[in-house]
A protein has these predicted regions:
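C-terminal amphipathic helix plus adjacent low-complexity
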Residues: 303-385
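A donor-sugar binding/catalytic signature common to diverse glycosyltransferases
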Residues: 102-105, 236-279
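A short, glycine/small-residue-rich beta-strand->loop->alpha-helix junction that serves as a flexible
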Residues: 4-18
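Conserved nucleotide-sugar donor-binding subdomain of glycosyltransferases
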Residues: 67-101, 106-111
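Conserved nucleotide-sugar phosphate-binding/catalytic loop shared by glycosyltransferases and other
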Residues: 7-8, 26-83
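Donor-nucleotide binding loops and adjacent catalytic segments primarily
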Residues: 21-22, 180-245, 255, 295-297
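A nucleotide-sugar donor-handling region in carbohydrate enzymes
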Residues: 139-204
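A conserved, positively charged/aromatic
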Residues: 123, 135-147, 239-240
Length: 385
């Protein structure tokens, strides 16, 4: 049995957990406070979902003293019923099922709590500067640390860690799909350019600058998906592939999904703790994979970024952006599954020696038929610096 914790904020953590669960051979249980549709669970006889109580709201919601235990943890509000029940469910599940490894995606408190049961823990490391005391603690207790970005983005040793970081590539729910199956940008002669504006569920209000960009461009078909009060579709794959340009925030799952579609992208990073999305956007810009706009940029700069990206997309004669290859989406879920299996079997040192291709997971980059782009690795996405 392999245990997986998926954070409830946004949809990306659950999507990543489901993708990796599908790539594993063992029984898997995903523990989360998020709502997971029954039809989203791969192989329900092997993969199960356990609902965790929320640790926010209700009594002891953080208004009381010391919700961070003196800065040593991120969120442990005193006398909070939900937190107590949450950690009790986690400990009881571990005691009952004795998982061979537990993957935390991602919570310092869950990481430490699982490790305190004597269970080997693997944790996801997110981009940004993560050298505060809670991250130092969490990084140090893990048997392995994984990152959902490519090797070209860098693999620094996270602050507090005793083991190297393993970048597995962008884990996307769309990794098995072919973005070239339908008409690609530049192949639809006579049609108006198509711009897709994605607004996710991870937070952030409506940025009215994009309304002005839409009005300024005028000559394009502008489609908006997601966001508070917006139109949602369960599967945006066709829209991703039909768009000449996609405008998106810089969340890890968002970028992985865009990479799977080999989309031409304008990235507008949202403000997140530890500079997470800013770090990802900076790496995309450094690798020449996206136009990046800032939160304070005027409308004319946003218009210019979209127009430049449209020009590249429309002149590409149907070729993708190259994001899929460079972001190493193909086989990423299998590579992360390989890390979990290696730790479960006590082969942590093999993970360190062999890097992303390990544990019998030779499908992946090789099986996809794609060769990774060789670029110097720099610690730009960086875990903690």
């Amino acid at each position: 049995m392999i245990g997986i914790y998926a954070h409830h904020h946004g949809s990306g953590h659950v999507q990543r957990a489901l993708s990796v669960a599908a790539a594993l051979d063992d029984e898997v249980t995903i523990l989360t406070s998020a709502r997971v549709r029954d039809d989203a669970v791969p192989d329900p006889g092997r993969v199960r979902v356990v609902s965790l109580p929320l640790d926010v709201g209700g009594s002891g919601d953080g208004a009381g003293p010391d919700p961070t235990a003196g800065g040593r943890l991120h969120w442990v509000p005193l006398r909070h019923d939900g937190l107590r029940r949450r950690m009790a469910v986690l400990a009881e599940w571990i005691d009952r099922h004795a998982p061979t490894v537990f993957w935390s995606d991602i919570s310092v408190e869950v990481t430490v709590g699982a490790r305190l049961t004597g269970t080997p823990v693997v944790s996801t490391v997110l981009p940004g500067r993560r050298d505060d005391a809670p991250h130092l603690l969490a990084h140090g207790v893990c048997s392995a640390l994984v990152a959902g970005w490519p090797r070209a983005a860098g693999a620094p040793v996270p602050a507090g860690a005793t083991r190297p970081l393993v970048p597995v590539g962008g884990v996307s729910r769309f990794a098995g799909r072919d973005p070239g199956a339908g008409p690609r940008p530049g192949e639809r002669h006579g049609e108006r350019p198509r711009v897709l504006h994605l607004r996710g569920s991870g937070g952030g209000g409506h940025d009215r600058r994009w309304d002005a960009v839409r009005d300024e461009l005028g000559e394009v078909d502008w489609i908006s998906l997601g966001g508070p009060g917006g139109r949602w579709v369960a599967d945006p794959w066709d829209e991703l592939c039909r768009a000449d340009v996609v405008i998106s925030a810089a969340g890890q799952s968002s970028i992985a999904d865009l990479a799977a579609a080999d989309a031409h992208v304008v990235v507008a990073p949202e403000e997140r703790p530890f500079g997470e999305q800013d770090a990802t956007a900076a790496t995309l810009a450094r690798l020449g994979l996206a136009e990046v706009v800032g939160r304070d940029d005027p409308v004319d700069q946003l218009v210019g970024a979209v127009r430049r990206t449209l020009e590249v997309a429309r002149s590409s004669s149907g070729a993708g952006s190259g994001l899929r290859e460079t972001w190493e989406v193909d086989g990423a879920a299998e590579r992360l599954a390989g890390v979990l299996e290696a730790v479960a079997e006590g082969r942590e040192n093999g993970v360190e020696r062999r890097g992303p291709e390990f544990a019998g997971r030779e499908r992946g980059r090789e099986a996809s038929g794609r060769r990774p782009v060789e670029r110097p690795a720099e610690p730009t996405v960086g875990a903690a610096r």
